[in-house]
């Protein structure tokens, strides 16, 4: 969910540094598998899904890289919901593997700014590890374009996802895949627009198809945002359908899309990407879905 040029980077850095000051990240994880107050469901011999994978690789975009969660216009993978080591997040990898094994047996191949068409390259990298589980969170950048006309078509989105899974299956046929739904971008607009600084950052080119003229509520602006919303919902339908055809793939059932991100879960740098708190909520959702009996 990132799209800025060098001039925008400089402008955002000056703006956010002046208002907030740069913050850091806690990169120390817990030493035991699973969150403190969370108990895994009892194993079931009838399920083909392994709820305790021994290694994890992550693919996707800036959300999985922890972009803007720790400081302005910077990736912060230590707070990634999928593979981060921060105790403030308690990532999926740490919950499943514990701190020590997560550091040795989890890899983050996500790239900020990636769209679905870029996922095959990341999957090829992940496949070389033959991980027990690959996490996928991609699609926001396909909707976040300069205009609604420039959004990735549903057909191309489907082809990109199918190709990415095909690449993985050729090299790692037994690897399981957890697919997170694309977040409800329109809700992020609704929450973020309440912050004056956030709207100033948005003017510098963040997700123009949705966030341009953030305060405009006329028919044209409403129709534009509805178009983005409908495309995101179509992307999620594709993720569900394609994943259902792979017996080792598990879609989150729209859990990320349905999650009601509030201002505490949004980056205080751009009011659009997940904050550290938001990353923790994504980790909770993923852990619940990966360890679910069904």
Residue ranges and their predicted role:
Residues 21-24:
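C-terminal motif of bacterial Sec signal peptides marking the signal peptidase cleavage site
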Residues 72-76, 269-294:
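C-terminal or late-domain output modules
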Residues 65, 115, 186:
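Flexible, glycine-rich phosphate/dinucleotide-binding loops
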Residues 104-116:
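Functional beta-strand-loop-alpha-helix junction segments that form "active/interaction loops"
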Residues 123-268, 276, 287-291:
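Alpha-helical cap/lid subdomain in secreted, periplasmic
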Residues 1-17, 231:
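N-terminal export and membrane-targeting signals
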Residues 29, 33-107, 126:
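Serine-esterase "nucleophile elbow" of acetyl-processing enzymes
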Residues 114-124:
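Structural motif
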């Amino acid at each position: 969910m990132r799209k800025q040029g060098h001039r925008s980077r400089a402008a955002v850095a000056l703006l956010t540094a002046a208002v907030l000051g740069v913050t850091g990240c806690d990169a120390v994880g817990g030493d035991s598998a699973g969150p403190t107050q969370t108990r895994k469901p009892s194993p079931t011999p009838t399920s083909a899904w392994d709820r305790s994978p021994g290694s994890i690789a992550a693919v996707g975009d800036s959300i999985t890289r922890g972009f803007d969660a720790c400081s302005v216009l910077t990736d912060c993978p230590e707070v990634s919901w999928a593979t981060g080591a921060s105790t403030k997040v308690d990532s999926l990898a740490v919950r499943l593997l514990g701190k020590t094994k997560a550091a040795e047996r989890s890899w983050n191949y996500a790239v900020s700014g990636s769209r679905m068409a870029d996922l095959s390259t990341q999957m090829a990298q992940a496949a070389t590890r033959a991980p027990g589980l690959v996490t996928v969170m991609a699609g926001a950048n396909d909707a976040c374009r300069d205009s609604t006309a420039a959004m990735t078509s549903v057909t191309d989105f489907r082809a990109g996802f199918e190709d990415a899974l095909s690449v993985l299956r050729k090299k790692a046929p037994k690897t399981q895949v957890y697919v997170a739904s694309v977040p409800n971008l329109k809700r992020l607009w609704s929450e973020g627009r309440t912050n004056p600084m956030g709207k100033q950052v948005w003017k510098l080119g963040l997700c123009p198809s949705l966030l341009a003229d953030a305060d405009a509520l006329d028919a044209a602006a409403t129709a534009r945002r509805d178009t983005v919303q409908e495309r995101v919902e179509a992307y999620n339908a594709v993720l569900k359908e394609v994943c259902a055809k792979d017996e080792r793939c598990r879609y989150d059932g729209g859990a990320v899309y349905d999650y009601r991100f509030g201002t505490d879960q949004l980056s205080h740098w751009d009011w659009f990407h997940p904050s550290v708190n938001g990353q923790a909520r994504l980790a909770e959702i993923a852990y619940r879905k990966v360890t679910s009996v069904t």
